[in-house]
Amino acid sequence: MSSLRTADDTWDIATSVGSTAVMVAASRAAETERDEALIRDPYARLLVTGAGTGIWESVLDAKFVETVAAADAEAAAIFEHMNSYQAVRTHFFDAFFTAAAEAGIRQIVILASGLDSRAYRLDWPSGTTVYEIDQPKVLEYKSATLAEHGVEPVATRREVGIDLRHDWPAALRGAGFDPSRPTAWLAEGLLMYLPADAQDRLFEQITELSAPGSRVAAETAGVQAEDRRQQMRERFERIAEKFDMTASLDIQQLIYEDPDRADVADWLDAHGWTATAVSSQQEMRRLDRWALPADLTDDDAFSNFVTAEKLS
């Protein structure tokens, strides 16, 4: 269970779950500036620097990164791994959307979109509409920040400012969503912030709204044994204290580690979808981005990247 979450908690871009979107955008910005980047997000740095979260802006400072590397090799490896994980994850789901567009899907829904910039940076075909669902303040920050810099979306972009714990299907329809048309759905960086029963309900709602030919992609929530979870928590607490990042790295307090959480691929297969799961470890190694210490094994809790298609 999460110790900082309540049934009706809300947030903006600088607090609670909202601030994790800044962390992810910081990783995309760092990746974009690599010589051989897996993804290019020219807007990530803009979104990070205006968020007011402090530490994630610092992570984009080359001198800070050099200081961490010089002071603590383990911390440097973990930060590198975190950035690489986000890059690999983004790369995987970018490819999912590219394939969906090539298959003729023109209706996109990004759940808990945060600072996702795909509506602005992917090469969407004409006639594509991207619906972004998230807390109103998060969506307002993103659209206002990019508009201030003259950035316009490539696709038609429609904001659906609502908590996913409320009646988001009705709000989505109200924004123009057509459930009779095939849709490509994405739940990236979301499921770990939902209790197990809420995850099931989310996929039930997606299924109800999906016409044949629809596709869905999701990053699963990893579940660890308690002793391993405590070991990882202590490792991150030590790093956070050493580099004055305590408030920013307390992500474990925001997520739900329900042991009875359904396997996403199995759930989809049982509810009218044909699903495939790729382990994040496998994908990171395939792209030569594995950087964690050797004491972490495949038995540790890493997410899977799941894609599925609804055939009927």
Swiss-Prot record:
Disulfide bonds, paired cysteine numbers: none
Similarity annotation: Belongs to the UPF0677 family.
Highest taxon of source: Bacteria
Organism of this sequence: Mycobacterium sp. (strain JLS)
Gene Ontology MF terms: methyltransferase activity
BP GO terms, sorted: methylation
Keywords, alphabetical: Methyltransferase, S-adenosyl-L-methionine, Transferase
Protein name: Putative S-adenosyl-L-methionine-dependent methyltransferase Mjls_0078
Positions contributing to S-adenosyl-L-methionine binding: D134, D163, L164
Function: Exhibits S-adenosyl-L-methionine-dependent methyltransferase activity.
Transmembrane recorded as keyword: no
Pfam (any one): LCM
Methyltransferase found in the keyword field: yes
Documented EC number(s): 2.1.1.-
